[in-house]
């Protein structure tokens, strides 16, 4: 597996990479890439970490599964490459940013600009078969990303966790609300966004928290 990952993350997660489950996961993923159409491309599997080094981390957003449509997944949860139409959840995220902060809806769904400011856009499962949602669930990725969240919770404080939907909320439950800012809402999917994602004001609330602890706010 082409593990392109920021050096500080590599050091923090080095023991995880050596565990038997991760070796089995690596074998599975290599076999899948060799025999099937898998997203994102191999060099982007760990892109969320490469774009957001541990020492710059301010915000954690947890997704579930990469997009499984052609040309969509780029290694950051909810993000798509330049020129790719916005999936519905991303459209709703941008709508809430606009309503909350007054920022215009961007022309690109590429969230590199968030990651480079310290937003870890972490899917629970980092790979998927084309057109088969959750096809790589249950093979070890969840254990690995649980370890990521646990490392953040143990080594960092003053982190904002944006937990959208019950899956993300379970995964982020380890974070201490006394030492961090925990923002919860329903998932931005069209199935649920109108039940509390719209109007949650997570983006302005995140920036207020960052300013309160002397950190630069995110340009959403």
What is each of the regions a protein language model found here?
Residues 3, 15-163, 167-170, 175-177, ...:
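A polyanion-binding, active-site-adjacent surface
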Residues 199:
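Short, conserved glycine- and acidic-residue-centered signature motifs
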Residues 1-13:
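Generic N-terminal amphipathic, Lys/Arg-enriched alpha-helix
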């Amino acid at each position: 597996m082409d593990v392109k990952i920021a050096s500080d993350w590599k050091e923090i997660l080095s023991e995880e990479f050596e565990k038997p489950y991760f070796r089995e996961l690596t074998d599975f993923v290599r076999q899948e890439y060799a025999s099937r159409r898998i997203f994102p491309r191999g060099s982007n599997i760990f892109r969320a970490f490469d774009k957001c080094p541990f020492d710059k981390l301010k915000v954690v957003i947890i997704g579930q599964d990469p997009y499984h449509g052609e040309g969509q997944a780029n290694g950051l949860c909810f993000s798509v490459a330049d020129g790719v139409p916005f999936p519905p959840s991303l459209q709703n995220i941008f709508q809430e940013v606009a309503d909350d902060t007054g920022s215009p809806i961007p022309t690109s769904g590429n969230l590199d600009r968030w990651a480079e400011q310290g937003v870890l856009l972490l899917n629970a499962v980092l790979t998927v078969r084309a057109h088969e949602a959750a096809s790589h669930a249950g093979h070890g990725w969840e254990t690995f990303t649980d370890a990521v969240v646990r490392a953040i919770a143990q080594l960092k404080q003053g982190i904002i966790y944006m937990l959208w939907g019950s899956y993300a909320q379970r995964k982020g439950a380890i974070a201490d609300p006394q030492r961090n800012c925990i923002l919860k809402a329903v998932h931005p999917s069209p199935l649920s966004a109108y039940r509390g994602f719209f109007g949650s004001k997570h983006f302005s609330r995140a920036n207020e928290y960052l300013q309160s602890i002397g950190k630069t706010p995110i340009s959403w």
